[in-house]
Amino acid sequence: MATIVAWESRNLQLQGGGGGHGGGGGGGGGERREYMFEKVVTPSDVGKLNRLVVPKHYAEKYFPLGPAARTSPAGTVLCFEDARGGDSTWRFRYSYWSSSQSYVITKGWSRYVRDKRLAAGDTVSFCRAGARLFIDCRKRAASVSSSSLVPPALIKVQLPPSRPVVDEEEAACGRRCLRLFGVDLQLRADASPALDLQL
């Protein structure tokens, strides 16, 4: 269950312009982590565009940009620790692209994708403990490939014999029957087969 914490933007490890180290792994080992959000990455998130689009409602809630950073093409730098421990610190350029009205993580993202071997369908999750930010990923569940499926056995189906449109007995009596849209229409023997339609 997620811990609800009163939060202000100054608690984030946001650094304007990319200076400073930030996000080191020291101290606060007993801090409780608050789950923020996760995203199933798309082909464009892990492809040659080298960027992760952060869903707008999560970006504005958890990584708000001040007016100066929002209008600056440089944005800011977010520093994340690896949620699984170790000494890995991930520094990402985070900015708002007004052209597409989206929040994106750019510089540093391609390294994370490569190091974690992310593929479309994998999930990236974000959490925090106080002012420390954490990132984690998990692979999508292995799907059953069509090559691993066993072909089904051939099944023989015995269909009932089809019913002729004109019954032999009715044909012998001189009556004709026409089946139209599942309805049997009885035709008179003296009726002309041609229809005289006047429009």
Swiss-Prot record:
Extract the GO molecular function terms from the UniProt entry: DNA binding; DNA-binding transcription factor activity
Write out the ranges of the annotated region (Disordered): 13-32
Q: Per its UniProt record, what CDD domains does this chain match?
A: B3_DNA
Tell where it localizes: Nucleus
Q: DNA-binding region spans which residues?
A: 37-141
What are the record's GO terms for cellular component? nucleus
Point to the regions of Gly residues compositional bias.
15-29
- Please give the InterPro entries that the UniProt record associates with this protein: B3_DNA-bd (IPR003340), DNA-bd_pseudobarrel_sf (IPR015300), LEC2-like (IPR044800)
Protein's recorded name: B3 domain-containing protein Os06g0107800
Q: Give a yes or no for keyword Zinc in this entry.
A: no
Say if the entry is tagged with keyword Oxidoreductase: no
* Pfam families reported for this sequence: B3 (PF02362)
**Main localisation, per the record?**
nucleus
* Keywords assigned: DNA-binding, Nucleus, Transcription, Transcription regulation
